[in-house]
Amino acid sequence: MPASFLASLRAWIASSTIGQRILLALALGLLLITARVISKSKGTMPPGPRGLPLLGNIFQLPKLPWYRFTEWKEEFGPIFSLNFAGTPVVVLNSHEVVGDLLERKSTIYSDRPRFIMAGEILTGGMLIVFTGYGKVWRKLRRAGQEGLNVRASEKYQPLQESEARLLTTNMLREPAEWDAHLQRAAASSIASAVYAWPPLTKSDDGLVHRIDELMRRLVMAGLPGRYLVEIFPIMKHLPTWMAKWKREGLEWHRRDTEMFEGFYDNVARFMASGKYKPSLTAGLIERQEKNGLSKKEVSWLAGTMIGAGAETTAASLSVFMLAMTLYPDVMRKAQAEIDALVGRERMPTFADRPHLPYVCALVKEVLRWRPVGPVGVPRRTSEDDWYKGYFIPKGTLVIANVWAMNRDPAIYPDYDEFRPDRFLDASGNEIDIAGTHGQGHVTYGFGRRICIGMHVANQALFIDIAALLWAFNIEAPTGPDGNPILPSRTDFVDEGLVFRPAAFRCKVTPRIDDVATMLATLEKNA
């Protein structure tokens, strides 16, 4: 996030005139002085690292800021403050602080900073993750929850089981292409839930790529400093002939709306014919009038679920593959649990889920060990607040350091080890970890902004992971000396939308010789 800001700032400084630089310095100075006067008149903000005059702490943040946030947590405590060129920032690093503020004071801490390009121009105010805490957000959120809550998500399980069988078959045919299979399976699984589409194939790669590009465009547009309109909001009102960025953004919005409304129309036609399967979009159309949503709002709510859900699920499955490669004992223990219950005559199903506690704990550990979203999208305080003697002014950016909370040694001893047993008691029953909404981790977020699709995501991860463990061994390749070539446990890449393992090699081999015959029989009888 800050890395993009710095790059944009340096580029602007290099191309600007001396007069423009002086005006920017004066504006920043006035903003900083005003902020300090107002802040000091009401109280002291939480402690934090010293920064530069005017620019504050923005030059102190690396490309992956959660590592630095976690270091500062050790120095300044579970809540500390920063200054981003005059904008106050508070970073939350513990379950207790997040519970006190984002959960119990959610009316103050549920708003977003204004994302003009990403949240207004490119999406017309209909991307729920960037939408401010108001009437539009509430009706979108309510409609989405109705279609993706625990009970509603169960309707998508037959489709997800079918996707898991296809994933296993594809992995058997082309084991070296395992990462591509995971990405296709993740996109196909969420698409089946959103639109009841049949399984995606290579012929659908263009469509999936277009949705992925849309999500990446939105993420990049949301980075601080990417567009000057975020610094000078009045620029939004420039005519399009004067603002190429605005003209291009509105054209992208038109194209993306046309695509999503086309998906909506297809579902509506199937509903009219009476031949349709349950899907998020079908439910949204059925309740459209009750929820007060327009066709465009339903189309965007459903369509953006695919991009966000596919990327995060695929990244989590990649973390699973990395963990199995590094922790073969964990893999064998999960396989033994599956074998004892399921046997070899059938694949795991959702009916087995309550009887596979170790596999369920393994899914939780995947999400905790290497969260694909190490910091949440920033929030903004909607009014002044005081917490434990500290003043948090209205308009403060609030960042939840998910990375630090998922690695809190007081809650997760040996936090850097992949150990599903941490979620089970001595009898093998699941342990509830306070402040995690029954998830065992905080990767899905907090309060009124908690991930709307987490139940569908949990289902997809469970059935895909159970199927892969049932069918395959996942191991490190061996070198010429016969020793395993282990992948890096720390080499990860930030792709904007997700944080995922860098490319690595692993060996995927069938656990039994006739697994292909068994899969063909299961698919025929499905």
UniProtKB/Swiss-Prot annotation:
Which pathway is this protein assigned to?
Secondary metabolite biosynthesis
Where does the record say this protein resides? Answer: Membrane
CDD domains from the xrefs? CYP64-like
Topology within the bilayer:
Multi-pass membrane protein
Keyword Heme present in the record's keywords: the answer is yes
Q: Please give the start and end residues of each transmembrane region.
A: 13-33, 115-135, 306-326
One MF term in the entry's GO annotations: heme binding
Chief location: membrane
What is known about what this protein does?
A: Cytochrome P450 monooxygenase that is able to use delta(6)-protoilludene as a substrate to produce delta(6)-protoilludene-8-ol.
Name-wise, this protein is Cytochrome P450 monooxygenase 58
- Source organism per entry reads Postia placenta (strain ATCC 44394 / Madison 698-R) (Brown rot fungus)
Tell me the classification of the organism that encodes this protein.
Eukaryota, Fungi, Dikarya, Basidiomycota, Agaricomycotina
